[in-house]
Regions:
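Extracellular/lumen-exposed scaffold segments
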Residues: 18-137
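Bacterial Sec-dependent N-terminal signal peptides
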Residues: 1-23
């Protein structure tokens, strides 16, 4: 039985390692109430070692920037400006020959929204971003 448990633990750790390569970012969300109609949506992204996420403020004609948009067909709320980003770094891209803005290890991104319908019970957004190590996904 002990050998089976050891094998199962080893097999589980191999599965987790494989999952890490396919999903190098984990995003948690929280909400901060500002007023009766305004809220901050806080995205806390944890990136696996060696991976980075591009900022929404990347220069034109460079890597794909982060985008937060309302899902098509959704209503009752709107985005207020661009999201606020914390803990970004500048990184020179040999490919684009430009300095780009990225997150390493952790990203905290805060998007303010305004309710246009106070009875709304769910907020659904697209969080589109490019994560890279030696290749991008």
């Amino acid at each position: 039985m002990k050998k089976f448990i050891t094998f199962f633990i080893l097999l589980s750790s191999l599965f987790l390692k494989a999952q890490t390569a396919n999903e190098p970012i984990k995003i948690e969300t929280s909400i901060q109430k500002i007023s009766e109609t305004e809220y901050n949506l806080i995205f806390t992204a944890t990136l696996f070692k060696g991976w980075y996420l591009y900022s929404q403020y990347n220069p034109d004609e460079a890597s794909l920037p982060l985008e937060i948009t309302i899902l098509e067909g959704e209503s009752g709320y709107k985005l207020v400006g661009k999201a606020d980003e914390q803990d970004t770094f500048k990184k020179y891209s040999e490919t684009w020959e430009k300095e780009e803005i990225v997150f390493k290890d952790k990203a905290i991104i805060t998007q303010r929204i305004q309710l246009t319908n106070k009875d709304i019970s769910e907020i659904r957004l697209n969080f589109f971003g490019q994560v890279c190590e030696t290749a991008c996904i």
